[in-house]
């Protein structure tokens, strides 16, 4: 809308609220064991669609670099999509990448909570008109986020607004590994980012907050028309 030169004061953004309840408490160690994730592995989990737009070849390349470098980082792609089989073939059996089928809701939330880092990965040059829905799920988990996305993208803006994670350039697999390793080496920062995301979810992405913003918008509009 801003690119169409609409006056800034005429634009009001009201975020969709998250459909997920607060994540139930779960045993992260038990979940990791069930999913085959090692206690000493740094699990970077991407959930959701595996399509063209996600550009997940970047993750495959990052996994290959991680294996060659002897990194503790392991990437997990959870879900399905029209690119999944192609990604499996391109991965070529690397030990630093695994695929997990879509899970029932409770198991899905447990998996998010058990991961060390949650990932949004986008194809370079992709400019979304909306925030990826996975981000609201990520924030609910209380885990830090890495967003591999172009600067100035909608996703980059949401990461900055929430303070919930780190942004790296889209299509840069080594930057992805460095970001994951930096969070693993700084657990205090990781906890802070995760807590920021949960706070953002509760204060900005809750149904109560969204309805309050709608009320405020309608009242402001009514008052302006009454002048």
Where are these regions (language model features)?
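Carbohydrate-associated surface elements
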Residues: 14-17
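A short helix/loop element that forms part of the nucleotide-sugar donor recognition site in Leloir-type
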Residues: 23-37
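Conserved donor-binding/catalytic core segment of Leloir-type glycosyltransferases
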Residues: 38-54, 60-64
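Nucleotide-sugar-dependent
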Residues: 54, 102-111, 118-139, 144-157
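Nucleotide-activated donor-binding/catalytic signature segment of Leloir-type glycosyltransferases, i.e.
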Residues: 72-74, 84-109
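A short, well-ordered alpha-helix in the C-terminal region of glycosyltransferases
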Residues: 175, 182, 189-203
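C-terminal alpha-helical cap of glycosyltransferases
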Residues: 207-227
């Amino acid at each position: 809308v801003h690119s169409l030169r609409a006056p800034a004061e005429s634009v009001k953004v009201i975020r969709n609220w998250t459909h997920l309840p607060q994540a139930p408490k779960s045993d992260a160690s038990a979940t990791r064991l069930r999913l085959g994730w090692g206690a000493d592995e740094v699990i970077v989990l991407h959930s959701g669609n595996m399509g063209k737009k996600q550009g997940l070849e970047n993750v495959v390349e990052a996994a290959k670099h991680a294996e060659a470098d002897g990194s503790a980082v392991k990437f997990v792609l959870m879900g399905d999509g029209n690119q999944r089989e192609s990604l499996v073939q391109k991965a070529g059996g690397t030990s630093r990448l695994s695929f997990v089928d879509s899970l029932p809701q409770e198991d899905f939330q447990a998996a998010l909570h058990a991961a060390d880092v949650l990932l949004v990965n986008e194809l370079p040059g992709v400019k979304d008109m909306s925030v990826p829905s996975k981000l609201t799920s990520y924030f609910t988990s209380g885990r830090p986020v890495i967003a591999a996305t172009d600067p100035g993208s909608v996703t980059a803006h949401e990461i900055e607004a929430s303070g919930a994670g780190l942004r790296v350039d889209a299509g840069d697999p080594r930057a992805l590994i460095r970001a994951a390793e930096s969070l693993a080496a700084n657990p205090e920062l990781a906890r802070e980012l995760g807590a920021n995301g949960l706070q953002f979810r509760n204060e900005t992405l809750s149904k109560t907050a969204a309805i309050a913003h709608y009320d405020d918008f309608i009242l402001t509009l009514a008052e302006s028309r009454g002048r």
